[in-house]
Amino acid sequence: MTPYLKIIKSSYTLLSFFYFIANTIIRTIQNVPTSHKIILVSLYYLVFSLFITRIFYGSPLKIISTYIYGKF
């Protein structure tokens, strides 16, 4: 298998995984009361934003502590 096909296969697998997780989250949210939906959506948004922050900027806790306490 060529390197390009490996990249395409791994990208497809990763997208399939995210699609499965998104569908699971959506089905879970649709089956709970409205007050719980707000809490779940907030929690999922927080986890997702921390995940994205960690990918691009490193540790979110380090960023927050640097913002609060200044440089180490």
From Swiss-Prot:
What this protein is called in its record is Putative transmembrane protein DDB_G0272126
Q: Name one GO cellular component term.
A: membrane
Q: How does it sit in the membrane?
A: Multi-pass membrane protein
Transmembrane segment boundaries:
6-26, 38-58
Keyword tags: Membrane, Transmembrane, Transmembrane helix
User: Subcellular location, in the record's words?
Assistant: Membrane
Organism, scientific name: Dictyostelium discoideum (Social amoeba)
State the source organism's domain of life: Eukaryota
Primary location class: membrane
